[in-house]
Amino acid sequence: MYQRKVRHRPVEAVAREYASFRGKVIIVWDDNIAADMHYAKALFRALTPHGKWWSSQASIYAAKDDEFLELAARSGCKQLFIGLESVSQASLNEVSKAFNRVDEYARAIERIHAHGMSVQAGIVFGFDHDTEAVFEETGDFLESAGVQNATFNILTPYPGTPLHKRLDAEGRILTRDWSTYNGRTHVVFQPRQMSPETLLAGYRYANARFYSLGSIRRRLSKSPTQLFWTLPLNLAYAFALRRDGFNRRAEGK
């Protein structure tokens, strides 16, 4: 899709558009705002005078750059979405993301927190190395690290991707109804170490556990953005999940 290129809008153009929005909170939509550190830091300096709050997405490696974190926080960043993907190093290695080091996750999150920003983690379930224990292990880590928000997804082999080609060759594609390929409501392939039903139930359980009131309370105590950012977002997620029938009792947990 991106043809292996990073494209930039001029910093001044982004800052003008940013300043033109009347709202206090802005989502800066960039798949990895830390992809070009020089550009990112120049952008943060340009955003600082406008006094708004913003969030965006970054790689875990952004947490290693103190200047990046300091400038982001000073410019109004309140949350970074970090694609952790998995708390299993074997699963990360499987999908060529060995550069994500699970043993460095907790420290990276701690560094982001130290600069007054919260973390939203992106998690995927269903890798070949995932066992039924992955749901509890993920929940335990996210709570212990004080992750403020999490977005969970079911691994989905979209048509045209190498993953779909491999699973199709292995006879593991279960349906070609593309409307079910949404990463949330259906498991469209045969997982290696559990049934499709177990994967779907585990995904639902992970959501329900993370956004339970007890988990919210425990994680809130570690949040640098507590009441004005973390609590409203968690309660909104919790309400939406309950509305859609995600609760621990329903999953037998």
Describe the function of each predicted region:
Residues 107, 162, 197-201:
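Generic recognition of short, well-ordered alpha-helical interface segments
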